[in-house]
């Protein structure tokens, strides 16, 4: 079910990126600023507001920290990683 959750969120996002975040996360704020600076849209799901979702996303990606970011452009769902990976990816 874990991958199904991510795929369902990606399917309904209608944005360039899908991002899972947490409260008080400086890297999440930095990712939002990065997307804004490049005029890229994103859909955000905050783990603190959706109990149980973190376990599904970790099971699907193996990525245990936030943010967890996916590129949805070109009709594909591509896991990028966290802020550092996304910053390098968008250079």
Predicted feature residues:
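Thiol-based oxidoreductase modules, predominantly thioredoxin-like and allied folds used
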Residues: 41-54, 63-64
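Nucleotide phosphate-binding site architecture
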Residues: 26, 48, 87
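Short amphipathic alpha-helix with an adjacent loop that forms part of the alpha/beta core around
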Residues: 54-60, 87-91
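Non-catalytic, surface beta->alpha helical segment in thiol-disulfide oxidoreductase systems
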Residues: 71-91
């Amino acid at each position: 079910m874990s991958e199904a959750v991510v795929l369902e969120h990606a399917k309904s996002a209608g944005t360039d990126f899908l991002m899972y975040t947490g409260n008080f996360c400086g890297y999440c704020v930095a990712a939002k600023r990065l997307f804004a600076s490049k005029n890229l849209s994103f859909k955000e799901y905050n783990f603190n507001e959706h109990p149980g979702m973190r376990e599904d996303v970790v099971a699907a990606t193996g990525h245990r920290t936030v943010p967890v970011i996916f590129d949805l452009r070109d009709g594909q769902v591509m896991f990028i990683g966290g802020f550092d990976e996304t910053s390098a990816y968008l250079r």
